[in-house]
Amino acid sequence: MDELVSHARYANVDAIHAKQSVEAVPLKSKKGLGGLINHGLLTHDLDELGISSATINIPISNFMHLSEQPGDIPYTYGGKTYYFNEQYLISSFDVVLQQTSQRGISVAGILLIAPSGDAGELLKHPDYNGVAPYTMPNMTTVESTQCYAAALDFLAQRYSDPDMRIAHWIIHNEVDGGIHWTNMGDKPIATFMDTYLRSMRMCYNIVHQYDRHSEVFISFSHGWNIAAGGGWYKVRDMLDLMNQFSKAEGDFFWSLACHSYPAQLGNPCTWNDAQATFSMDTEYVTLKNLEVLDKWVGISQNQYKGNIRRSVWLSEAGTCSPSYEDKDLQDQAAGFAYGWKKINALDGINGIQWHSWFDHLGDGVPLGLRKYSDEEYKGEAKPVWTTYQKAGTDEEDDYFEQYLERIGIESWEGLIQDIP
C-alpha cells in the first residue's frame, strides 16, 4: 500500500529560468495612487502629487479570446494559440504605463477574472456562485489551467518592457471576501487558500522568467481577526495558512496588499476606529493601527526564508468625504494626514496607493482625491488632493498642522504605538 511520506514541493523559485533581465523599479517615496486609468489628468496628477507607486486593474477576460476577433494579437503558448484585443491593451494599459514608466513609477497590476466572454467562461471556477463580479481561476482542468498560464505569460512578457512596465502583480481582489469578490463557491478556508496559492505561485513562477524582481501580493480587506463580511474569512487566519503552505510546499516571495480603510467605510475619522486596537488580536487593521502590520512583517516566522521582510502595500486605502460639505471634506483630509504620519514613520509599510483617484459610484462612498468626473463636478480636486500633494514635501509640517485640533491631538509626536 502506497503511503505519502511528505508534502508535495514546488520547484525552487531561485532556479527559475530567466528569459531576460530587467532592472528593479524601486519606490522613491511612500506615496502612490490606486486604479490608474487613461484620463486627461493622468500626467498632471502623477507629477503634481509626486506619485511613486500605483495600481492598475487587469481584467483578463475583457481582452482575451479563445478564437480570433478583428484586431486581435495571436499568442501561442503550450502549443495552443490565444488572442488578445490590441486596441483594448493600448488604450487601457499601454498609454498609462508609458507615462508611469517615464517617471520611474512602480506599478502593480491587479489580476481580475470576470466570468464573461469565451475566455472568462473557460477560466470560471466550476463552483463559481454566479453572482460575484470575479471568479477564482479554474485550475481543475488542463485546458483552463493552460489558458490562465497563457494569459499570465502574455502579460508578463508584454509588460516587462521598460517602456511600459508592470513591476508587480496583485492576485485578485480582497480574497478574504472570496464569497463576494474572488469566488469559487462557499469553501473551507484551507481549500480556498490551497487554490489561491496555486494562482499566486503560477503568476510568480511565470513572471519571474521575465522579471526576477517582481513580487506577487495577496489582496485583503481591513478585517484582521474578524470576518469583515458575511461568509468572509479572517485575514490573520489566511496569512497563517500562507506561512504553513509555504513551509510545507516551498517558500516564495509573496507580499501583502492591504485595504486599510476605516472600520466604518463612511466615517473618515479613522483615528476614532474603536475596532482597530493596538494589539495583534485587533479586529480591524485601518490607518489607525498600521503598527500591527508593521509588527507582523517584522516577525521572523512571517518572513521570506525567515529573514527577508515581505512588502506591505496599502494598495486600496483612503478615507471618504461622506458629502461635499466643508466639514466632511476637511475630515477626509484629516484622516489622510493622520494615516500618512503613521505610514511615513513605519519601516514595514512600503507605501499607500490611495483609492480612489476620482469619486466613483461603485465605491459606495466618495473616496476620491477628486470629485465625480461628470458634467456637474468635472473631477474637481477636493481638499484631500492638496493635502496629498503636500505630504512628503518640505511643506508637510506646516500644512498638516491645521488638522491637529480636528483629530484631537496637540502634536504628531507619540503617534506611533507599541504593539505588545
List PLM regions with ranges.
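Boundary/entry segment of secreted carbohydrate-active catalytic domains
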Residues: 1-62
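Structural preference for beta-strand elements that scaffold enzyme active sites
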Residues: 28-32, 52-55, 104-108, 166-170, ...
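Short, acidic/polar
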Residues: 35-48, 148-158, 232-245, 330-342
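Noncatalytic carbohydrate-binding groove/subsite architecture in carbohydrate-active enzymes
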Residues: 40, 166-167, 191-326
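Substrate-binding cleft and catalytic face of glycoside hydrolase catalytic domains
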Residues: 52-226, 263-264, 359-364
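Aromatic-rich peripheral "rim/lid" segments of glycoside hydrolase catalytic domains that contact
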Residues: 72-73, 126-130, 161-165, 180, ...
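Alpha-helix N-cap and loop-to-helix initiation/capping positions
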Residues: 84-88, 139-147, 187-195, 230-234, ...
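A structural motif corresponding to the C-terminal end of an alpha-helix
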Residues: 92-107, 158-165, 202-214, 245-252, ...
